[in-house]
Amino acid sequence: MFFRLDLESCMKFEKLGQSGRARRGRLTLAHGVVETPVFMPVGTYGTVKGMLPRDIEEIQAQIILGNTFHLYLRPGLEVIKEHGGLHEFIKWDKPILTDSGGFQVFSLGAMRKIKEEGVTFRSPIDGSKVFLSPEISMEIQQVLNSDIVMIFDECTPYPATHEEAQKSLQLSLRWAKRCKTHHHEQLNNTNALFGIIQGGMYEDLRDESLNGLLEIGFDGYAIGGLSVGEPKEEMIKVLDYLPAKMPEDKPRYLMGVGKPEDIVEAVRRGVDMFDCVMPTRNARNGHYFVTDGLVRIRNSKYRHDQSPLDPHCDCYTCKNFTRAYLYHLEKCGEMLASMLGTIHNLRYYQRLTQGIRDALEQGTFDEFVTDFYTRRGLDVPPAPVD
């Protein structure tokens, strides 16, 4: 099946296959093609920490994520505009998704004030007063020339009462309408615009948020407000019902998630796109994802271990260095430890999603899931019930 998402958008989405709820798809964007399910490395400040652009290409990343909030504050729009956009500034010629800055603004807590017009906050860099609104967020992301633009929304905190979550999502819906109007009608931006579903842990509010976004109409839909401190059982509960209600012909993006197991479970429930800082952050702390689970390289048992980090991995780190060497680098506090670890962890995530795509193409996704958990010594969680 093939769909043109929106006559005003240059993005196309094609669903290539399905196993249960799991989907194999393809996104065509202004800067290239993205095969889904996909994991997007996070490049908050215009760089994936510890990685050269050529390293990101070598791990076979298809698309990366940038942060509107941080890039707006530093280096600022003028510098990026002088370079002709974020792609040229950071020397990355493949697709980029930028979040709107909403999550970062609302994580400032008492440092920000929310009004209907937008949010006023103190810059965490120099303390100056900054105002961010749906319209300004759209203008920033146009200067960045993001292939996928995210709407400016309020990320519902956890925990939140039903009343608090409803008030928050209704503000986000009003902002979503303003985002679309400004993106399409004022800016004439043909890059993709995604809506973000909020509503906390309440199914009726998630429905209200989704239905409101559908009335406005977006090129894709993201699930926000998860991985914000809720128990995993709560996250799975939302994923059990929400993706199945989202449009079949548009990409589904789970924001900020997460662990390899979370990605597998979300794919089983119909999600297509993921991002998370976990692989890079864990690498800087000596925690490496491997086929059989997790290696904490600072453990003294690796001091004489001459095996590669993961014998199943084809990354630069695993093809050239032993666990003993990585242990040595960590104990010495060498910068190279986090660099080699980041290369490996991000390649692991790319191999994971590539394996999922291959299994979906070959009709062996159930076997893939069983093998994934068996290698970790874990029981296979129940499949979602349709």
Swiss-Prot record:
Cofactor(s) the record lists: Zn(2+)
The entry's keywords: Glycosyltransferase, Metal-binding, Queuosine biosynthesis, Transferase, tRNA processing, Zinc
Coiled coil: none
Residues covered by region (RNA binding): 256-262, 280-284
Residue ranges of the TM segments: none
Family matches, as SUPFAM superfamilies: tRNA-guanine transglycosylase
Pfam families per UniProt: TGT (PF01702)
Pathway involvement of the protein, from the record: tRNA modification; tRNA-queuosine biosynthesis
Cofactor: binding details: Binds 1 zinc ion per subunit.
Xref: InterPro entries: ArchSynthase1/Queuine_TRR, TGT, TGT-like_sf, tRNA_ribo_trans-like
Residues that, per the record, bind Zn(2+): C313, C315, C318, H344
Catalysis performed (reactions): 7-aminomethyl-7-carbaguanine + guanosine(34) in tRNA = 7-aminomethyl-7-carbaguanosine(34) in tRNA + guanine
Binding-site list for substrate: D99, S100, G101, G102, F103, D153, Q198, G225
Any GO BP: tRNA wobble guanine modification
Enzyme Commission number(s) of this protein: 2.4.2.29
An example Gene Ontology CC term for this record: cytosol
Active site (catalytic residues): D99, D275
GO MF annotations, alphabetized: metal ion binding; tRNA-guanosine(34) queuine transglycosylase activity
Quaternary assembly: Homodimer. Within each dimer, one monomer is responsible for RNA recognition and catalysis, while the other monomer binds to the replacement base PreQ1.
NCBIfam families: Q_tRNA_tgt (TIGR00430), tgt_general (TIGR00449)
Listed HAMAP family: Q_tRNA_Tgt
Function: Catalyzes the base-exchange of a guanine (G) residue with the queuine precursor 7-aminomethyl-7-deazaguanine (PreQ1) at position 34 (anticodon wobble position) in tRNAs with GU(N) anticodons (tRNA-Asp, -Asn, -His and -Tyr). Catalysis occurs through a double-displacement mechanism. The nucleophile active site attacks the C1' of nucleotide 34 to detach the guanine base from the RNA, forming a covalent enzyme-RNA intermediate. The proton acceptor active site deprotonates the incoming PreQ1, allowing a nucleophilic attack on the C1' of the ribose to form the product.
PANTHER family in the cross-refs: QUEUINE TRNA-RIBOSYLTRANSFERASE
Family per record: Belongs to the queuine tRNA-ribosyltransferase family.
Name of the protein described by the UniProt record: Queuine tRNA-ribosyltransferase
